[in-house]
Amino acid sequence: RPGMNIAWLAFNTAKPPLDNPEVRHALALAINNQRLMQSIYYGTAETAASMLPRASWAYDNDAKITEYNPQEARARLKALGLENLTLKLWVPTSSQAWNPSPLKTAELIQADMAQIGVKVIIMPVEGRFQEARLMDMNHDLTLSGWATDSNDPDSFFRPLLSCAAIASQTNFAHWCNREFDDVLQKALLSQQLSSRMDAYKEAQRILARELPVLPLASSLRLQAYRYDMKGLVLSPFGNASFAGVSREKTEEVKKP
């Protein structure tokens, strides 16, 4: 089942030309997400349409996966006067819960960008140094992700994309949007679940419009079990509940 995790590509919105949402949307069109699913995850993840995993109660079912259209991407960049663009993509070197092979992912993105005339230079970064290096703001793009043991949508949005998260060094996009922050605060203060859900859906629409980060994948939670076991429930956090588990009766095969 879908897990409470997300892998994404962050644009450094503090650096031109990535401070322009139109540029970010154009670059997003160049990424072949279906190939990422086949070459990186091998069926153990689903393409992400939102920064909020599908397992969340506030997930926007109207969220759309960014289409793959390199011809349109090239045309948009040309219309914006951007040709022969070179970008630095900073990538963690080690496997992560939301991305088993970040470097291979970066190479696939590099190849996709080359198809639209954008040169991507891959900059491998050791995990423990990644946050500090990204806060220097020298990167253009970075691959990252997030997993949480909380089902509260705020645990995804606020630590990663709020204005305050820039100072706490977890907002790798360096994106600060007061409208987005206000919506998060409205959701946090609301006492009604329906109102919170509406606010978080609005937050997802803002992210889809501004695109400071491009959601890539949400890893599935997998559990191996016997063929005759019934009623096993796996939570989005990876925990298994055996409360309703039973074994299906099968005829015993008598040995001769």
Report residues per predicted region:
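Short, solvent-exposed loop/beta-turn-alpha elements that line the ligand-binding surface or hinge
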Residues: 1-3, 10-20, 57-71, 133-137, ...
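Pocket-flanking alpha-helical
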Residues: 9-10, 17, 35-40, 128-163, ...
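Extracytoplasmic
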Residues: 4-6, 47, 84, 211
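Short, solvent-exposed turn/loop segments enriched in Gly/Ser/Thr/Pro and often Arg
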Residues: 43-46, 146-148, 217-223
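Append "and occasionally in soluble cytosolic enzymes with long acidic Gly/Pro-rich linkers
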Residues: 18-111, 115, 176, 202, ...
